[in-house]
């Protein structure tokens, strides 16, 4: 007994169940074969992807077909919630794996291409390794040229003397001896 249902895009035989979903931005058709545990997804743009599961997954699955319209133009498959969730999880995992594999391949290809281009066309220029070692040498050179403790102490002693001299001129007061000096301010001792 082979019954055919007319779908939005194509014909589906009775031995194959399918789900038609209308999302906000696109339509998705899920086609599942009863003989195998594979699932194919056909998007609105015509791109299809597939996912396969184990035999236990197939046995646990309940599929009920319902006709939406009386004339039989469209149909939907209603899965148990857990089955839908597993279907989407499997699809997401597969997409993530494919993406990570393609990114790994791309990055390794890019690195090898960069090395080859540096080796063949830039023989007069510094390579990445040479640049890194030059920067490390500069850092090491700066570390060896650090001032000693006595030089640092002398620097701050001189700065402190200059600051005291500045206050002495500005406020006409000797802060070391704590005595007023002659100048624009007149100091009065408080009792």
Swiss-Prot record:
Residues 62-81 are annotated as: Disordered. Ubiquitinated independently by RKP and SCF (SKP1-CUL1-FBL5/SKP2B) protein ligase complex, leading to proteasomal degradation. It holds the Pfam family CDI. Residues 162-191 are annotated as: Required for inhibitory function and interaction with CDK kinase complexes. Coiled coil: none annotated. One of its GO terms (molecular function) is cyclin-dependent protein serine/threonine kinase inhibitor activity. Specifically interacts with CDKA-1, but not with CDKB1-1. Interacts with CYCD2-1 and CYCD3-1. Belongs to the CDI family. ICK/KRP subfamily. This is Cyclin-dependent kinase inhibitor 1. It comes from Arabidopsis thaliana. The gene is KRP1.
